[in-house]
Amino acid sequence: AMARMGVRTGYVGKVGRDTTGDFFEQALVNLGIEPHILRGNERSGRCVSLVSADGERTMCTFLGAALEMRGDELNESLFDGYDCLYIEGYLVQDHELIGRAVRLAKACGLTVALDLASFNIVDENLGFLNELTDGYVDVLFANEQEAFSFTGERNPLEALDKISRKCPLAVVKR
């Protein structure tokens, strides 16, 4: 969406040496997004989104080559000319990678936005996510389940209040 509005956007990731990886990279180019794509030995990842009649969604993910990405593959030049690093939470379990990404982004003056991705990921990485949010995250996105896992608050407004004390901008989605 940002690229379509004329905002310079880029994507950093790792895909396989396969036709799916080629497709992903070309799709980014076609959308006006600068691809900073690394190639791994594993197959390219995929995600299937299942949506029930009442709107509940379940994401079935195979991260594939994305799991091969390492922090030492990132450098400051990847962040040159950008204003914001948006972290999609499915790779948060790689603390070294995400830690390096946020440190580099902050060193380059970027805003850091984090989408928590899944309550399961929050549950498994709560300590690390708190450290990230306290030290680096400027914008945090969470749905109600993720916000509950992150804060312990069942009421979305109370969860939003707790999150907003940790970072400048908090968003709790339904």
Residues covered by each model-derived region:
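Ribokinase/PfkB-type carbohydrate-kinase core domain
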Residues: 25-39, 51-174
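Substrate-binding N-lobe of the ribokinase-like
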Residues: 1-46
